[in-house]
């Protein structure tokens, strides 16, 4: 019978890797706790309309990359391709904004039908924050600072923050008209994807990876030239806030985000730790999204990080599997019957305990215990089972002592 394999782009996380993931997730969780950001968990499966309305039907995500299907009730459903729209939907549905502004974080798997490559899979994992109901430019600064500080806490090196303002809706429409007019006169010089985007999502042309298109864009109208005075002042306040925190930034007038809901502040944090610059965090402000999804008008800002990309940057040494504290070794029927009860007692007092159930001789079991990195081995033979006196061996020094089974938990000293 043919061996079944995981689907392309759907990667198993094996035990050797999960300890590193747990460390990363716990580091982020503690970072968010100290920033007074509460966790929210949303379903993996949502109505397709949520993303069509929230992200934008003209985006690559909605047009090309979503996993969508009709369920048995003929409802169009989609595996979430990103987290923001789901968080906003949940906040609206459960009236969170009626309770005041919300500082939320989320984490978990997302799904996009893309070509798998290093740091990017079809099932991928993100963590992100969403500040809902915060209009002050200082909230943009704080959100960026939280991302920057988390990346530094994780040990990511070579960080660079790129910053832009997409302005208000009116600013973007003014710029869109100017850009479309300029590019239409040079349409034959654009790559095929950019020619298609000219009619559907022209701002995304600024993010083209085609070298010829990027060369052409050097002379294109600049988004900053279309900013109104209030938008320009807001942008200056964000930059001043970052400078006050000594967070270095580079203004990039070509920086746009791939989702339609962004406006005003947009940013990406990259790292050159792997050689080329790789984006590790992206986000910005999305003041119109809550209202667009049927909620009250609310100013919002947030960001997301891809965990697979972070794992590549962290390398193999970021966190190793934790060894057991104790390995319980037994030989003989009476002794083997005690092995699991002894392990259970030790676990109840906080020890990490492995039980060797191989049935091999004491020598082989002790050798395996030593290789495991454990500090202690508890040896139980039939004689120990009969007397109730167990052997405790220090695997670092080789010293042994006896300890009474009846008072094992009370007398155990690590």
UniProtKB/Swiss-Prot annotation:
GO terms for cellular component: cytoplasm. PROSITE patterns: AA_TRNA_LIGASE_II (PS50862). It is an enzyme of class 6 (ligase). This is Histidine--tRNA ligase. Its EC number is 6.1.1.21. SUPFAM superfamilies: Class II aaRS ABD-related (SSF52954), Class II aaRS and biotin synthetases (SSF55681). InterPro entries: aa-tRNA-synth_II, aa-tRNA-synth_II/BPL/LPL, Anticodon-bd, Anticodon-bd_dom_sf, His-tRNA-ligase, HisRS-like_core, HisRS/HisZ, HisRS_anticodon. Keywords: Aminoacyl-tRNA synthetase, ATP-binding, Cytoplasm, Ligase, Nucleotide-binding, Protein biosynthesis. It catalyses: tRNA(His) + L-histidine + ATP = L-histidyl-tRNA(His) + AMP + diphosphate + H(+). Belongs to the class-II aminoacyl-tRNA synthetase family. Its main location: cytoplasm. NCBIfam families: hisS. It comes from Synechococcus sp. (strain RCC307). Homodimer. Signal peptide: none annotated. One of its GO terms (molecular function) is ATP binding. It comes from the Bacteria.
